[in-house]
Amino acid sequence: MAVISMKQLLEAGVHFGHQTRRWNPKMKKYIFTERNGIYIIDLQKTVKKVEEAYNFVKSISEEGGTVLFVGTKKQAQEAIKEEAERAGQFFINERWLGGTLTNYKTISKRVKRISEIEKMEEDGTFDVLPKKEVVELKKEYDRWVKFLGGIREMKSMPSALFVVDPRKERNAIAEAKKLHVPIVGIVDTNCDPDEIDYVIPANDDAIRAVKLLTGKMADAILEGRQGVSNEEVAAEQNIDLSEETEVKAEETTEA
């Protein structure tokens, strides 16, 4: 049985690409035709590519790996959060902070700050601090939860990235490539497919299309994991992300 059907793709509007004047020639092999100034994506190829991506993500999950879901454009934010959480994975759906992967030592301090401020509220520290200081602490807390809440429990380098719109997420892609983290991505007709290891040619602007495809990647993780929890995965890996980043960065420099 196919991972996804042509009917599902058509109903979600996956086949609608960008205007013909806004395209990347490298996407030509994934384009079926042009209609009213808009490129139509070849859904037969999308079906095949979804299956390839699904099997790859499933294999990662079977081995106890993790996937970082990244989608900060408005059309992707909700689906990225919901599907990553459903699959017990990590996500960034507001803004990619520079160094999220390549400089995790600094990022981890900000993540740790979330817990520190929570503890201050729980142990009564807020009650003895000036009201102005408490307001500032709450603002700081809200900021870090907004940008980093989705990777709060990420203790090791993700096994792969899943991104919606490589043009929008170019910084995330650059960091992943530097650290040799494979990338699965929803790639529209205006994007460069060469940046992505597992290309899913599809409309990256329609909420239904993004939801459908992101959901399929979450399904792959759940099928592969078969009940293994994030806590068990983290315990099995037992790797500190900041240390792993340093090792990979050194390997890249030496190469």
Curated annotation (Swiss-Prot):
GO biological process, one term: translation
Positions of region (Disordered): 233-255
Keywords: Ribonucleoprotein, Ribosomal protein
Classification via Pfam families: Ribosomal_S2
InterPro entries: Ribosomal_uS2 (IPR001865), Ribosomal_uS2_bac/mit/plastid (IPR005706), Ribosomal_uS2_CS (IPR018130), Ribosomal_uS2_flav_dom_sf (IPR023591)
Superkingdom, taxonomy of origin: Bacteria
Compositional bias (Basic and acidic residues): 245-255
PROSITE patterns: RIBOSOMAL_S2_1 (PS00962), RIBOSOMAL_S2_2 (PS00963)
Cellular component GO terms, alphabetical: cytosolic small ribosomal subunit
Transmembrane parts of this sequence: none
SUPFAM superfamilies reported for this sequence: Ribosomal protein S2
GO MF annotation terms: structural constituent of ribosome
Similarity comment text for this entry: Belongs to the universal ribosomal protein uS2 family.
Protein name: Small ribosomal subunit protein uS2
Organism of this sequence: Macrococcus caseolyticus (strain JCSC5402) (Macrococcoides caseolyticum)
Annotated gene: rpsB
